[in-house]
A protein has these predicted regions:
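Portal/gating segments that form or line small-molecule/metal binding sites
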Residues: 1-142
């Protein structure tokens, strides 16, 4: 059974807004290493759309946006290659190596956890809260 790990960047005062911190090289290196330890990522709609719009273009075209430093490329390539499951009742279509996780959330995630592998990672705020309420998160990283 593979574990479900929750990882989020949070400030000491409890802020989880990605715009409230400076994403430095060490943070991106750690994030790429963390993602490489997972077989798949679980995203809610908001996190999926945020990550897809920010990281997919560079990984696919090799052209970095003006805001992206060269040391961000390994993270972009790692997250681009990762398998993704998206929980959403409003999105009609996903790609980016992703598929929908539909039906009962608890049952669907339990099925994923029962598969062999290194583990699953979830980020964001709403989906992890629901998973925590179901008792499905095995490890927390802040």
């Amino acid at each position: 059974m593979r574990p479900l790990r929750y990882s989020i960047n949070v400030t000491l005062d409890g802020c989880c807004d990605h715009r409230a911190m400076i994403p430095d090289e060490d943070l991106h290196r750690h994030a790429a290493e963390t993602l490489a330890q997972a077989d798949a990522l679980l995203f809610g709609r908001v996190t999926y759309e945020l990550m897809e719009s920010g990281w997919r273009p560079m990984a696919r075209t090799g052209v970095r946006p003006d805001w992206m430093a060269d040391w961000m490329e390994p993270f972009a390539k790692t997250i681009d290659a990762a398998r993704k499951y998206v929980v959403s009742s409003t999105l009609a279509h996903v790609d980016w190596n992703a598929e929908f996780l539909r039906g009962d959330l608890g049952e669907a995630v339990r099925r994923l956890k029962q598969q062999p592998g290194k583990g699953l990672y979830v980020g964001g705020a709403r989906l992890p809260r629901a998973l925590a309420e179901l008792g499905l998160i095995d490890e927390y990283e802040f």
